[in-house]
Amino acid sequence: MIIGIPKEIKNNEYRVGLMPKHVNELSKKNEVLVQSSAGTGSSFTDNDYLNAGAKIVNSIEEIYYNSELIVKVKEPLLKEYNLIQPKQKLFTFFHFAASEELTLAMMKTKSTCIAYETIEDDSGKLPLLTPMSEVAG
């Protein structure tokens, strides 16, 4: 599988979809593409990702056009909608309930959208929301 990590383009969003240590694990059985400077806001360099086994690409278009799975932090913005490919999988915080526009746009892409905020563990808890809740207080 080809996994793509684009640089977040939402204002004041400095997080990155995957840290180099996770890329290191994933790159053992997958190809991982990271957009140049995607990790800068989280203090990760392109070299950190290269050393973890990723390939650095220059543009967000390269990420979307070449990846089967996109791993982000925040929902796609309007200028990303046309980059999403049919049958592509997107893994991010979507918050669909807050945006009918986003929901309809993602339906039109015919992609598979997996929202972090809806993933439950066996006990019914939302493990991907817990770290964000702790940070937010």
Q: What do these predicted regions represent?
A:
Residues 1-36:
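N-terminal phosphate-binding or glycine-rich loops at protein starts, especially the Walker A/P-loop
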Residues 2, 76-137:
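Glycine/serine-rich phosphate-binding loop and adjoining beta1-alpha1 elements at the start
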Residues 24, 47, 61, 81-82, ...:
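Alpha-helical segments flanking ligand/cofactor-binding loops in enzyme cores
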Residues 39-40, 74-76:
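Short, polar loop motifs at secondary-structure junctions
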